[in-house]
Amino acid sequence: MGYPTGRRRVSIFVDGANMFYTQKKGLGWFFDPAKLLRVLREDDQLTDAYWYMGLKQPPDPRDENFVRFLAYAGYVVRTKGLKTIYDSETGETTQKANLDVEIVMDMFNTVNNYDKAILLSGDGDFERALELLRSRGKELCVVSTQNWIAAELRMAVGSHFLDLQELRDKIERTDRGPAPEKPVTESPGVGQ
């Protein structure tokens, strides 16, 4: 398909919670969100990049710094307060902020702004949304890891799957942990 500018218009949608656990448990290393954005938009015209994440209430200062870092790097950050979920069988509680609906809403509300959607998630709940986007003529790519992607999501995109392991040398963080250690003003920008 030829594009008027010679480059595809691309929007990126990052399921932050899914990517956190993919990195922590699936990869054993963390990527730098600014480096990731540079790599994913390399040959294309970036129209939007969204990062979705749950926040403790009140927000933890590290989370607030990470949100500022993401915005500085070029992401539109969508947040939702974490909810406590009680499991009556085990008596355990977990905290969760499900942003799947927000991701799909943004995918469809901005559908005329991009030619290609890149989803960073391994969550099979996105299978139907991707099928509908494909029926509207959109190119799709899912970024995750082989071991942390639902089979139905992997099958929905076929060869349009990118394994984070293949990008490690370009996107791996060189500092510790998933949140920036330095103030936002010292974090590298997307264009640097």
What are these regions (language model features)?
Residues 1-192:
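Terminal and domain-boundary accessory regions
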